[in-house]
Amino acid sequence: MGQREMWRLMSRFNAFKRTNTILHHLRMSKHTDAAEEVLLEKKGCTGVITLNRPKFLNALTLNMIRQIYPQLKKWEQDPETFLIIIKGAGGKAFCAGGDIRVISEAEKAKQKIAPVFFREEYMLNNAVGSCQKPYVALIHGITMGGGVGLSVHGQFRVATEKCLFAMPETAIGLFPDVGGGYFLPRLQGKLGYFLALTGFRLKGRDVYRAGIATHFVDSEKLAMLEEDLLALKSPSKENIASVLENYHTESKIDRDKSFILEEHMDKINSCFSANTVEEIIENLQQDGSSFALEQLKVINKMSPTSLKITLRQLMEGSSKTLQEVLTMEYRLSQACMRGHDFHEGVRAVLIDKDQSPKWKPADLKEVTEEDLNNHFKSLGSSDLKF
């Protein structure tokens, strides 16, 4: 066998090995380790969901989605279930997002996982948003991307001082999905637009002050709060709200500190009220304050395509229902999978970690209206339907 043939054989073998590794991660396994990625327990009249991948900051997998969705639906219909609690194991994270590295690697290996993953993830986001039973998300630790989708659409979101919120998708060539187009434009003023385009991180009580959490509890009291919720007998929504309100009122950490963005809200509202990303950049340049220039520096590092998609996503989402937004975001997700920037962003941030993505196109002015329209185009029979 010649050297060239040997090289071809080795290349094929390596590709085969990569594909098998990816499939191993994504397969709907019956094995214990896959089942234990999420714990589903009935405690009295409460259904408890525990995201259980602490080594991976409870990043969301297709297997987890496929366990949570049917159980959530069952509990919603069960007359003996009065409350649903969702939390993360390990203390560091509620959920750091979807396992996007695996999705990107699968796409590169021609394993079409993304259409299934995003479809089922968004179906779950909608199920959380439409859940008829009180739904309490204990967002302690890192809560980003897919973790936001599992919490923000529910009735109650309880943050602690360890909560770290962000929608950092424009830095990896994506957009703030999982219903970001619904909840972000509904935050005060233009705060949601600012968070979406810059990926700015909010911590602790600021997650509550921004309107993302409904309550704040000191982390040392979180276990007690959960115990008190579990002790409720056939509680009404009002009973649950009362317990949460009591803990919120008693919380002490950062109680007297003002919202971290309070002094900048006027700038945020004026700079981010523009209808194009180019105008937002111009507004920040003209403002010239250290805060504005800092945000300008951040925005200039993001994927130009992602920035334009995101602004339009939020503008359109401001007048849509959650289901309409998720249908739109599914179209965007599939367009991003077909494109360059998502895979390049994952490479630069999560794989090689050189933090130097080479975006294509690299300049905002090269992202045309036609490019944008193609991202938002209907997928016909492949559209997400509820």
From Swiss-Prot:
Q: Which residues bind substrate?
A: E121, G146, E169, D177
Q: CDD domains of this UniProt entry? A: crotonase-like
Q: Which UniProt keywords apply?
A: Acetylation, Branched-chain amino acid catabolism, Disease variant, Hydrolase, Mitochondrion, Phosphoprotein, Transit peptide
A single Gene Ontology MF term assigned here is:
3-hydroxyisobutyryl-CoA hydrolase activity
Question: Which reactions is this enzyme annotated as catalysing?
Answer: 3-hydroxy-2-methylpropanoyl-CoA + H2O = 3-hydroxy-2-methylpropanoate + CoA + H(+)
Instruction: Give the chief site where it resides.
Output: mitochondrion
Leader sequence segment: none
Task: Give the metabolic or biological pathway.
Answer: Amino-acid degradation; L-valine degradation
Role, per record: Hydrolyzes 3-hydroxyisobutyryl-CoA (HIBYL-CoA), a saline catabolite. Has high activity toward isobutyryl-CoA. Could be an isobutyryl-CoA dehydrogenase that functions in valine catabolism. Also hydrolyzes 3-hydroxypropanoyl-CoA.
| Record-given protein name | 3-hydroxyisobutyryl-CoA hydrolase, mitochondrial
Identify the species of origin. Homo sapiens (Human)
- Gene designation per UniProt: HIBCH
